[in-house]
Curated annotation (Swiss-Prot):
GO terms for cellular component: cytosolic large ribosomal subunit. NCBIfam families: rplP_bact. Belongs to the universal ribosomal protein uL16 family. Residues 1-17 have a biased composition (Basic residues). One of its GO terms (molecular function) is tRNA binding. Binds 23S rRNA and is also seen to make contacts with the A and possibly P site tRNAs. Keywords: Ribonucleoprotein, Ribosomal protein, RNA-binding, rRNA-binding, tRNA-binding. It holds the Pfam family Ribosomal_L16. This is Large ribosomal subunit protein uL16. Residues 1-24 are annotated as: Disordered. It comes from the Bacteria.
Length: 137
């Protein structure tokens, strides 16, 4: 599971996820990419489940890049505990995703194989996505 090795602070405030992706919005490493079209939070488990779906479909061919990293801690209080007494414990980590963020990239496979692998991966994610090509300058 993805999570930071160490952080400056253990817990974070929730914040707001507004605007469009200013960086990480182009296919830079591979030939094809899976780009988010809606905003949301991807948990480390969802990122891993989608990665497994991609790798299972492409088998040994091709290389896959994960372009998002869950670096935001989400806290939760235990069940049946009254409010107060401080913030809850960190339960899981999320990556905040904005429209335009490239989530995964792939190279070394045919377009049909990449499309199908990304379709399987998109079913595991809570955001809507689209298939992207690398822009040749």
């Amino acid at each position: 599971m993805l999570q930071p090795k160490r952080t400056k602070f253990r817990k974070q405030q929730k914040g707001r996820n507004r605007g469009l992706a200013q960086s990480g919005n182009t296919v830079s490493f591979g030939d094809y990419g899976l780009k988010a079209t809606t905003r949301g939070r991807l948990t480390a488990r969802q990122i891993e489940a989608a990665r497994r779906a991609i790798n299972r479909h492409v088998k040994r061919g091709g290389k896959v890049w994960i372009r998002v990293f869950p670096d935001v801690p989400v806290t939760n209080k235990p069940l049946e505990v009254r409010q107060g007494k401080g913030k809850g414990n960190v339960e899981y980590w999320v990556a905040k995703v904005q429209p335009g963020t490239v989530l995964y990239e792939m190279e070394g496979v045919t377009e049909e194989l990449a499309r199908e692998a990304f379709r399987l991966a998109a079913a595991k994610l809570p955001v809507q996505t689209t298939f992207e090509y690398r822009k040749v300058m």
